[in-house]
């Protein structure tokens, strides 16, 4: 009874299409894709900034340890 079959998934998909319509689902998918791209870009920018800061710290340590 708790198993999810292909027919149950098709019924749920049909209900979603009937409730929201195909146009709304297309715009929702596009908005979701844009949000994911923005999130990934922000994460990459943050990682690049952290690497630059870490690289600067390493250079500062090398210079300070030179005698």
From Swiss-Prot:
A GO biological-process term: protein transport by the Tat complex
Localization per record: Cell inner membrane
Membrane topology, as annotated: Single-pass membrane protein
Region annotation Disordered: where it falls in the sequence: 46-67
GO CC terms in record: TAT protein transport complex
Transmembrane segments: 4-21
The keyword Metal-binding is annotated on this UniProt entry: no
Family statement: Belongs to the TatA/E family. TatE subfamily.
Function: Part of the twin-arginine translocation (Tat) system that transports large folded proteins containing a characteristic twin-arginine motif in their signal peptide across membranes. TatE shares overlapping functions with TatA.
Database matches in PANTHER family: SEC-INDEPENDENT PROTEIN TRANSLOCASE PROTEIN TATA, SEC-INDEPENDENT PROTEIN TRANSLOCASE PROTEIN TATE
Protein name per Swiss-Prot or TrEMBL: Probable Sec-independent protein translocase protein TatE
Organism field: Citrobacter koseri (strain ATCC BAA-895 / CDC 4225-83 / SGSC4696)
Organismal lineage: Bacteria, Pseudomonadati, Pseudomonadota, Gammaproteobacteria, Enterobacterales
């Amino acid at each position: 009874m708790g198993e999810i079959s292909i027919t149950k998934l098709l019924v749920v998909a049909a209900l979603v299409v009937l409730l929201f319509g195909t146009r709304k689902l297309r715009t929702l998918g596009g908005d979701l894709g844009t949000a994911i791209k923005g999130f990934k870009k922000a994460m990459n920018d943050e990682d690049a900034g952290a690497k630059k800061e870490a690289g600067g710290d390493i250079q500062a340590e090398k210079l300070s340890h030179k005698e």
